[in-house]
Amino acid sequence: YNRTTDPMHKEIVREVFTKLLDSGFLEQRTMQQYCSVSDGSIRFLPDRYVEGTCPVCSAGGARGDQCDSCGATYEAHELVDPSSKLNPDADIEVRDTDHFFLRLNDFQASLEAHANDRQVVWKPNVRAMSKNWLDMGLRPRAVTRDIDWGISLPLEGDEWSSKRVYVWFEAVQGYYTCARIWGSRYAAAEGHPEGELAWEKWWTVPQDGEHPRHIYFMGKDNIPFHTIIWPAIIMGLNASEGKADIDHLLSSGDLVLEDNVSANEYLMLQGGQFSKSRKHGVWLPAFLERYDPDTLRYYLSINMPEGHD
């Protein structure tokens, strides 16, 4: 088990950022971002710091980077009628800010080939959402943010000191960083002959024999991060090591792509989806004070939202 606050996780994320940047898969761009202006102070409002109306489905309560109602993602400035979650009374402006973008468009053909290869194992909702992203045409996606928490950029210069790595570019790497942390800290002590490189058994394509299989379980809002963004990062890393061309999915020594992404639809409560951030749910400690856990296990088993909300 590992946490993304682990110092070695941060070190590896910066390493990945640097490799992708040096290989040309990250590029610097100027983007427009909402910011709040209050009492002479200015604060950028990325992602969940801003809320408004979805530009795709017109649902209220949409976030700065994604709509929970329809699953759409969009550019930050496309959100309609924005307001600050930190200070709803603050004035909202659009300002230019420089960030680094992952060139997802470079991986379009490879990701389409990968998706076609997974058609027989992906569930219909995974196939549909991934196809929607690919059919719209992939475009560069920002992987840094104007925030004061998170992993700092491995770059010098005052212009980058206030930027941090975007949480979803960083968090999906936790599968990979956790394995490397285990190898570094525990593998040799546990007697693995490969020492700190023992993690590679679980992550790289061997010269012969079956490669390790990775299966991810999640809610549907996380599908594109695991079928588009995370595979693109892995493809970029493989290419940065000179092990593979991004047009060839896997070669010996490469980091493996996922075998399956198993995603459920939303579990609903009183007409709305369960949501920790919105405090809409049934909290386990309170439930267990009154009911046996097997009651909940049975209910979730027969009502698991595998095909629809």
Regions found by a protein language model. Name each.
Residues 3, 11-12, 57, 80-309:
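Structured secondary-structure scaffolds
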Residues 1-114:
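N-terminal, positively charged nucleic-acid-binding surface of large information/translation enzymes
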